[in-house]
Amino acid sequence: MNDYIVVKCGGSMLDQLNDVFFDCIKKLQQQYKVVIVHGGGPEIDAKLKDCNINVEKRDGLRVTPKEVMDVVQMVLCGSTNKKFVMNLQKHNLLAVGCSGCDGKLLQVQPVSEEIGYVGEVSYVETALLKGLINMNYIPVIAPIGIHDNEIYNINADTAAAGIAAALSAKELILITDVDGILHEGKLVKKTDESEIATFIEKGVITGGMIPKVQAALASLKMGVQKISIVNGTKDFTEDTGECIGTTVTRGVSIV
């Protein structure tokens, strides 16, 4: 059990997770060393609305001036992270919640001044993750990072990909509410970069699946070898640890 697996769970999925999801995490833990990264978009947007702070997005990234970053930090590192940790522990999964600024876990480079406190992962302090795992804890990471002693928001997909690449993880698992990529009503079990481009061009991949596959492609570019898009509301893990869904690699596809 030397291989790492990184599981990314978007904020919109956190309230949909059922017993099946936690059973799948237990199965993964029997085969791999597990790290979880979570988002929190819906809860952040709701809190910003409560605070009467307008939200602007550019190219899918939330524009994050200081007052927005304060709310992002409060939600991601506070309520969202701790609720997820408590839910894992309710299902007998020992977990430790932390953010990318704890122990300088996630160091970032700012994306641009125009979008404020938004960063991309430049360095991962893997020793912290490995230490927690060696003590039989699952690290549960809120995707914020640091740069020059300032806190930055990180897209959860790219945070998970950065962590997976730094750990040389066997796989990055993207938890969604769909079974994977469907083609003519059938699940595409394996695909690659070129086939995904064809699927998008032909309209096979549309709507909410497009950002999911774009996240998978971005992860490949960051050095992750394999990404699986799975349905977190169903049993997505074989007893062997293999995922049930769509697996994206750089190699030749087998549909």
From Swiss-Prot:
Main location, first listed in the record: cytoplasm
A single cellular component GO annotation: cytoplasm
Q: Does the keyword Kinase apply?
A: yes
Residues where substrate binds: 40-41, 62, 153
Q: In which pathway does it act?
A: Amino-acid biosynthesis; L-arginine biosynthesis; N(2)-acetyl-L-ornithine from L-glutamate: step 2/4
Q: Which GO terms describe its biological process?
A: arginine biosynthetic process via ornithine; L-arginine biosynthetic process
**Enzyme Commission identifier(s):** 2.7.2.8
Site location (Transition state stabilizer): 8, 212
User: What does the record give under GO molecular function?
Assistant: acetylglutamate kinase activity; ATP binding
Q: Where in the cell is it found?
A: Cytoplasm
What's its top-level EC category? transferase
Pfam families tied to this protein: AA_kinase (PF00696)
Catalytic activity line of the entry:
N-acetyl-L-glutamate + ATP = N-acetyl-L-glutamyl 5-phosphate + ADP
InterPro entries, alphabetically? AceGlu_kinase-like_sf, AcgluKinase_fam, ArgB, Asp/Glu/Uridylate_kinase
Q: Which UniProt keywords apply?
A: Amino-acid biosynthesis, Arginine biosynthesis, ATP-binding, Cytoplasm, Kinase, Nucleotide-binding, Transferase
- Role this protein plays: Catalyzes the ATP-dependent phosphorylation of N-acetyl-L-glutamate.
**Family that this chain belongs to:** Belongs to the acetylglutamate kinase family. ArgB subfamily.
Q: What is this protein called?
A: Acetylglutamate kinase
Query: From which organism does this entry originate?
Result: Bacillus thuringiensis subsp. konkukian (strain 97-27)
Q: What is the lineage of its organism?
A: Bacteria, Bacillati, Bacillota, Bacilli, Bacillales
Point out the gene that encodes the protein.
argB
